[in-house]
């Protein structure tokens, strides 16, 4: 049955329509906001045997027809998803995943297909709401619904779902998702925004989210299918007690080993011994293979529960963390710059057993990344790429192209540094930072942010302020709340909230928060962000002990950038027909040249000499030719009425036969030949811009001198 519902959001109409399209999916909805239209489907298949995780897939599919264009690829089809699409898929996945039942092993796939784009209404936030509606309408077990909005900060005012013009001026790009009772996810990039403003923005977002959730609850009541009844295999109290008795003291001791690899090895040994013990017991009890494997899965699950309980108890009741630290204690920090001799800038940031090497490369304007997408074509001159090789955790695995995690962490690091990157007018280079994770025990994305700051300053990039990042955790048991600074893997896994905060001394530049429980109040969040600020400033102080400001000079191996400005109508003189002149300059000098439409010229040279040569040629090309100027020109062409002489690269004038010499000249070839260099004087520039020259007058001028 076809139905639709509409709600006012930030002055626009958000509409959800079902029962008309994609009806074979478990749940489907067409979501509209302004002229932006997204089809979102939710589908479930049979459970996968033998897996110990929930197989949720979220795909965000951009279609170029949504903006009335044909793809530019050879096949004229869309290719692999852009990073923006991958980030949108992660944005949808993160708040939804915790809301599926524990132990649910059915494949669930959510596909958001962008059908039409209105630049004032962003499709990713519409897709997030659409995904929740599709799940609410479906028979898939789901503890939702959720809503999501964006918040901007324009002229000091917080704005819900800012339009394109407002986004351009905004100091904040915040996305918040949550249920009626709690915020579940926060993702933000900001221009040094204070913690108080960030909290106000999150609170404002949650007020709007509540309205969206109420509408979705109404949608579920009116058109939702009966939910699939899922029952999880439950362990018997007797077996649960026996497992706990068998592993309790050993596991407690193992989890208190400070060193990660040693601790993991001991935990793995306990798991292996426990599984072997109970496998033998099940066989002695006469269980068949199917039942035995089923029971062993429950043993594994109970071991995991025991680990979680013990880690949480240790932290909440004793105030001690697995590596022996206090809740607010940050691991030992060690930094280094100038690590690699031939690169343009490098830095290593180490915090405990987490280590990142960041490397800066400076390039030309033409090295900017071109962003083809569902909107105006843009370029990006600051890029941060994050690599997470298997050796960083002491494992082996095939090396593949960057996955969602690498893309997400790279984008977070990029967002954190973007507000402090100098403007192109001040520093005209394209900047690429690559962060290689060398060791990992939690918080690698924040280590890459700190490493990026060190490397940028080592490269001599005049960043406005140094940036540091820290990963925080939170555990809540009844009314007791413990906030953890600089979390490691176990604390992230067993905690109730993890949040990553990056920024300068002046404010936040990036924030990522995932909350797994209800009941996190504004006061708790305020306290957590205050602790994060203290940790961030402590880390900044440690970093600045190694390098306290950008180096005054670039690396000798970095290219030299020379900028100059020419009149826009002179650009054609530099480029020449078919790029002939600019290519000749590049071949002769070995430089790279980029020209903007406003007449800005960027010359990237490996040394000062070649850069100056290119600049000199361009100056000659763009120099205004004036009557009375004298040039040393080369004869390019001879006709029966005169000779054409090149006075500047690509600029020619005519020396009429009567202007070649003081005496009568019968043949032009009697005076000049092709290739001769001769002095000429500009005697006229006609209304068409044609230049008339004189050899005889130039010679007279030279004699006077």
UniProtKB/Swiss-Prot annotation:
Involved in mRNA degradation. Catalyzes the phosphorolysis of single-stranded polyribonucleotides processively in the 3'- to 5'-direction. InterPro entries: ExoRNase_PH_dom1, ExoRNase_PH_dom2, ExoRNase_PH_dom2_sf, KH_dom, KH_dom_type_1, KH_dom_type_1_sf, NA-bd_OB-fold, PNPase. It comes from the Bacteria. Keywords: Cytoplasm, Magnesium, Metal-binding, Nucleotidyltransferase, RNA-binding, Transferase. SMART domains: KH (SM00322), S1 (SM00316). GO terms for molecular function: 3'-5'-RNA exonuclease activity; magnesium ion binding; polyribonucleotide nucleotidyltransferase activity; RNA binding. Transmembrane segments: none annotated. Residues 628-696 form the S1 motif domain. The lineage of its organism: Bacteria, Bacillati, Bacillota, Clostridia, Halanaerobiales. It holds the Pfam family PNPase. Its main location: cytoplasm. PANTHER family: POLYRIBONUCLEOTIDE NUCLEOTIDYLTRANSFERASE, POLYRIBONUCLEOTIDE NUCLEOTIDYLTRANSFERASE 1, MITOCHONDRIAL. This is Polyribonucleotide nucleotidyltransferase. Belongs to the polyribonucleotide nucleotidyltransferase family.
